[in-house]
UniProtKB/Swiss-Prot annotation:
Record's protein name: UPF0291 protein Sez_0489
Keyword Secreted carried by entry: no
Predominant cellular place of this UniProt entry's protein: cytoplasm
Subcellular compartments: Cytoplasm
GO CC terms in record: cytoplasm
Family as reported in the entry's similarity comment: Belongs to the UPF0291 family.
Alphabetized Pfam families for the sequence: DUF896
Length: 85
C-alpha cells in the first residue's frame, strides 16, 4: 500500500480520537482501512502458499489443502498432472 495512504489512515485515526470525523471522512477511513486489510490478507496468503513443511526425516508433510493450491500455481515442483506432488 502507498505510504501516503497509510499516513492518511493514521491521520484520520488521530483526528477521530481528538475532534471526531465528518461523514465523508468516516467513509474515506473505512475505504482506506478495507484496502489496507485486503492488501495484508493478500500478502499473508502469498507467504503461506509458498511454505513447504517437512518433518525431521525430510518427508513433505504439507497439508493437502495447501498442496492443492501449490499444484494449481506450480509451486515447489508440484503439478496438477502429478497428484503425488
Amino acid at each position: 500500500m502507498d505510504p501516503k495512504k497509510i499516513a492518511r489512515i493514521n491521520e484520520l485515526a488521530k483526528k477521530k480520537k481528538t475532534v471526531g470525523l465528518t461523514g465523508p471522512e468516516k467513509v474515506e477511513q473505512a475505504k482506506l482501512r478495507e484496502e489496507y486489510i485486503e492488501g495484508y490478507r493478500r500478502s499473508v496468503r502469498h507467504h503461506i502458499e509458498g511454505i513447504k513443511i517437512v518433518d525431521e526425516d525430510g518427508n513433505d508433510v504439507t497439508p493437502e489443502k495447501l498442496r492443492q493450491v501449490q499444484r494449481e500455481k506450480g509451486l515447489h515442483g508440484r503439478s496438477l498432472d502429478d497428484p503425488e506432488s
